[in-house]
Amino acid sequence: MSKKAVVLYSGGLDSTTCLAEARAAGFTPYALSFHYGQRHTVELEKARLYAPQVGAADHMVIDFDLRRIGGSALTSDEEVPKGREIDDAIPVTYVPARNTIFLSFALGWAEVLGSFDIFIGVNALDYSGYPDCRPEFISAFEQLANLATKAGVEGQGQYRVHAPLLHLTKAQIIKRGLELGVDYSLTHSCYDPTPEGLACGLCDSCQLRLKGFAEAGISDPAAYAREVQR
């Protein structure tokens, strides 16, 4: 019988590949998504549709509202940058403590499930400078998980936070996902989609996605609101 793993699953390119990686590693994935007041809820709609198709044993969607905290263009009326040159500075699309919050929910569910494995699709190469996508953060949270839980303190097992995409480029992630059978037409990456759910093609996330597909030599199957170089 395969081991259970909680997989943070947004419906985006990286998290969908990460879920496929969990399955390939022999885990039974329990997908965990969040409706946190983000403007790009079409991503969550993709997650709801795709989770059963990729073999998730269960798919939990947790609702809470980070708009009450604000501090991000993804949870406020602040404009999402378009067409900028991506650098190492932390952008306005950073959501304060988001991955810490997400991983905390994942840890709680994992403890209830009797699982000691959590998967997250963070990437430290082709990303927008987010502090909670770095190896140091993953290592620190893993240590916290083993200090902050009944199961960890009682020595029932050792929690591990798996980040299989951490050191891959976006092109490598896409190629790996295709090897694992991921259908990227069922994923969404855009931070600021149209009301019809079309990707803008200009935000950081769209730029990184398009760049990844171009470098992989593969046409991006996503639907865009404007002509893009695929």
Curated annotation (Swiss-Prot):
InterPro entries tied to this protein: QueC, Rossmann-like_a/b/a_fold
Record EC number: 6.3.4.20
Record-listed Zn(2+) binding positions: 190, 200, 203, 206
Primary enzyme class: ligase
Residues annotated as binding ATP: 9-19
The protein's required cofactors: Zn(2+)
SUPFAM superfamilies in alphabetical order: Adenine nucleotide alpha hydrolases-like
Free-text remark on how the cofactor is bound: Binds 1 zinc ion per subunit.
Keywords of the record: ATP-binding, Ligase, Metal-binding, Nucleotide-binding, Queuosine biosynthesis, Zinc
Coiled-coil portions: none
Catalytic reactions of this protein: 7-carboxy-7-deazaguanine + NH4(+) + ATP = 7-cyano-7-deazaguanine + ADP + phosphate + H2O + H(+)
Metabolic or biological pathway, per its Swiss-Prot or TrEMBL entry: Purine metabolism; 7-cyano-7-deazaguanine biosynthesis
GO terms of biological process kind: queuosine biosynthetic process
MF GO annotations: ATP binding; ligase activity, forming carbon-nitrogen bonds; zinc ion binding
Function description: Catalyzes the ATP-dependent conversion of 7-carboxy-7-deazaguanine (CDG) to 7-cyano-7-deazaguanine (preQ(0)).
Family recorded in the similarity comment: Belongs to the QueC family.
Name of the protein: 7-cyano-7-deazaguanine synthase
The organism of origin for this protein: Syntrophotalea carbinolica (strain DSM 2380 / NBRC 103641 / GraBd1)
Gene: queC
